[in-house]
C-alpha cells in the first residue's frame, strides 16, 4: 500500500516510555501520565507556533516538573502533580527511579537523559531534596555566580551542548539571569537511532509536497517498500505506520491524515490521551510502499506560557509560588522563566533528536504531503 505525504510538517518528538503486554504498574503510571501530559501540551504548542513546523518533547518537560513538584508545597505542589499525572511524591519517585534503571538497558540506539541543578553561590539545596535529586533523577549540582550572567549562561549552555551532541545551543539567554536568580534546573535528552531497514539514498528524489489545497512544492522524499506495522483509522481519519530502529526496542510512529486539510481534525482527536493507544492495537504487519520527506526541525518554546495554559499557574507567580523545599534558606522562590529547545532530523540512515529545558527559579520581587506528519518516538521497555 502506498503511503505518500502531503502539506506542512508538524512533528512531535514525544519520547514515551512504553511497554509490551507484561507492563508493570509503574510503567503503566508513566505511560498514562506521559500520554495525558502530551495530549494537554500538544494544542498549546501548536497555538504558540501557528502554521509552523514544530518539534517538542513533552516527556522531557515532565522530569524537571516532577522535581519541582517534590520541592513544592500547597497549591503549587497540587497543580504540578495534577499536571504530570502522578498521584503523590512516593509514586513519582518510584516511577522515575524505575525509568532511569530501565532506559539504561534499551538496545540498538543511543538514548541519554541528563539533569542538572545550578544554584547561586551562598545557597544550598534542601537536604531532603538534594538526596531525591541525586538518587531519583540522577541530577548533578553545581554552584554558579548568576550575577556574572554571561559566564553563567555559557557554563549552562556548554553542559547542554555536551549532553545533546551539540544539537541544542544557546538554551539560556544571559539576560534571564541576574542577582535574584537562586537556581536553574536543566534537563537534556538526546536520541539517535538507525533504521532497522534503511532507505536507499538513490531512491530519494524531489516529489510533490502539498502545502495546502492550492499550493504544492517539491521536496527531497525518501522511498522504500517493505513490511511495516500499519493501520488505517476511521476514528482519526488517518493512516499510521511504525518504523522500527535497530534493536527493535524503539520506533518512530507516523500519523498521516487522509485529506490535505485533515491536520486540524487530527489535532482535535489527539486531545484524547488514549486515542493513539486504541489505534495502535489495530495495526498489523503488511507490505507498505513508504514515502517520507527528509526533514530537520528546530523549535524554541516559551514553556512558561504553555504551562500556564495547562493550569500550572502558582509556580510562576511571585506572590503565590511555594518552592519551600528547594533550598535550605526559605526564600520566597518562583519560576521566572521556562524554555525548551528541541531538534529532530530524519534521513535515510535514521533519526536524531534532542530536547533541553531550562527552569529558572528567582527570588520573588514581590518580597523584594498535509499539515501532515505527527511523529512520536517510542521506547519499548521490556521488564
UniProtKB/Swiss-Prot annotation:
A molecular function (GO) term? serine-type endopeptidase inhibitor activity
Signal peptide: which range, if any?
Answer: 1-21
Q: Which family does it belong to?
A: Belongs to the serpin family.
Site Reactive bond: give positions. 363-364
The protein depicted here goes by the name Serine protease inhibitor 3/4
Quote a single Gene Ontology cellular component term: extracellular space
Presence of the UniProt keyword Signal in the record: yes
Keywords from the named record: Protease inhibitor, Serine protease inhibitor, Signal
Which InterPro entries does the UniProt record give? Serpin_dom, Serpin_fam, Serpin_sf, Serpin_sf_1, Serpin_sf_2
List the Pfam families: Serpin
Instruction: Please verify whether the record's keywords include Chloroplast.
Output: no
- Superkingdom, according to UniProt? Eukaryota
